[in-house]
Each structure stands twice: as C-alpha cells, then as structure tokens.
Regions:
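Residue-level signal for functionally critical sites in structured catalytic/ligand-binding pockets
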Residues: 11-16, 23-27, 31-34, 61, ...
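HotDog/MaoC-like acyl-thioester-processing domains
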Residues: 2-6, 65, 69-74, 82-138
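Hot-dog-fold acyl-thioester-processing enzymes
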Residues: 1-58, 116-138
C-alpha cells in the first residue's frame, strides 16, 4: 500500500480549553494531506479545477478520534485512495503522533466529481484517476 504522508504540528489554534486538539481540527489535517497528495501527482488545486473543468465537493466526511494531541505535537497524516467509483473517489486518512505506532485518528472523505456549470455528477476524469492510481489500496 502506497501512502502519501505529510507532517504538521498541532498549533495554538488547534487546541481547545482542555488543552487538547479540538476534534474538528482533524479535518484541517485531512485537508492538508489531500491537497499535498494532489500537488505531488501534478494536480495542484490552484490549477486542477480549471484544467479538468470539474469541482470535487465532499459529500461524506467521517473520522474516529482515538487519542488526544496537545500543543506542538508533531503528527504524521497519511492518505491513500481506498476506492475509485464511476463519479467519486474515497480518500482514507490515518493520523499518528510522530514516532509512535498508536493511531490518533483515522477517517475517510468521499469526493464526487461534478460538472462546474450544472453541479451534476459526471465520470471522474481519466487524468485524475491515472495520476492518483499509485496511491490506490489494492
């Protein structure tokens, strides 16, 4: 399984009054990993939507919280494609504190490819699938 991994610190804006990461901030980590995955395969978000003439709205977001993180923890966020559908793809994420084997959080996001003018589902562009295929869990 080929995963794409980023490193990110838990920042002041990520923590809540209890001094641990606010659960919603895991979505920030997921979004950074997703964006950097796309950039790494030549599909930077600053260009991909215009080039392919599509949008990729998220229609499902799920995550499980396993262990707390605190300010300045360095985390590793891994992402891979768990599924290509006809009009959608599912990205799976795992969050670990750097150097520790225990899972801190994991989850998935489903993106649907839609026509930019009608906002109706359309097949995933072949270029998108081909470029992300190395990160598909088989």
């Amino acid at each position: 399984l080929n995963k794409f991994t980023i490193r990110e610190h838990v920042r002041w804006s990520d923590i809540d009054r209890a001094g641990i990461i606010y659960y919603g901030q895991f979505l920030r980590f997921f979004e950074i990993a997703e964006t950097e995955l796309f950039r790494s395969v030549g599909l930077p978000y600053s260009e991909v939507f215009d080039r392919l003439n599509v949008w990729l709205p998220r229609v499902q977001i799920h995550f499980d919280f396993h262990k707390p993180l605190v300010l300045d923890d360095l985390v590793e966020v891994s992402v891979h494609v768990s599924r290509f559908g006809r009009t959608s793809l599912t990205l799976r994420f795992e969050v670990h504190k750097e150097g520790e084997p225990d899972l801190v959080a994991d989850g998935h996001v489903v993106l649907v490819c839609v026509d930019r003018s009608k906002f109706k589902p359309i097949p995933l562009p072949a270029e998108l699938v081909e470029r992300l295929k190395p990160y598909l869990a088989e």
